[in-house]
Amino acid sequence: MILDASAIVSILIGEPDSARLLQHMAEAPVLAAAAPTLLESTMVLSRHFKGDARAVMNEFVREFQIEVIPFSRDHYDVAADAFYRFGKGQHAASLNFGDCMSYAAARLSG
């Protein structure tokens, strides 16, 4: 299961759908997130936690044994393609920057 920033943030700030997300995570054989997704999540969480959220993110990655996917040139190519096919102003899906990164990670991870 590839995690995106919205799912990670939802879980860590305890949004109403976090229990459902945690259940899906528990059922997944592997959990992974692209390295840029972790940065995006940390940046959003810093607003919620009023400061440095790296420790929170690092604990989440450790606790759930999340595989961190490096973001390569191939990821860039797939993410850019996703933007031009499904990005804001291009398609009803309106994928944003983080969405395109998660899409690329999912596509290239199989």
Each predicted region: which residue ranges?
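Structured helix-beta-strand junction loops
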Residues: E27-A28, E63-F64, S109
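Active-site-proximal, substrate-binding regions of enzyme catalytic domains
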Residues: T42, H48-F49, R54-E67, S72-D74
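Acidic active-site catalytic centers that drive phospho-/nucleotidyl reactions
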Residues: D4, E40, D99
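Short, well-structured N-terminal submotif of metal-dependent ribonuclease cores
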Residues: M1-A33, S46-E59
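Active-site neighborhoods of divalent-metal-dependent phosphate/nucleic-acid chemistry enzymes
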Residues: E67-G110
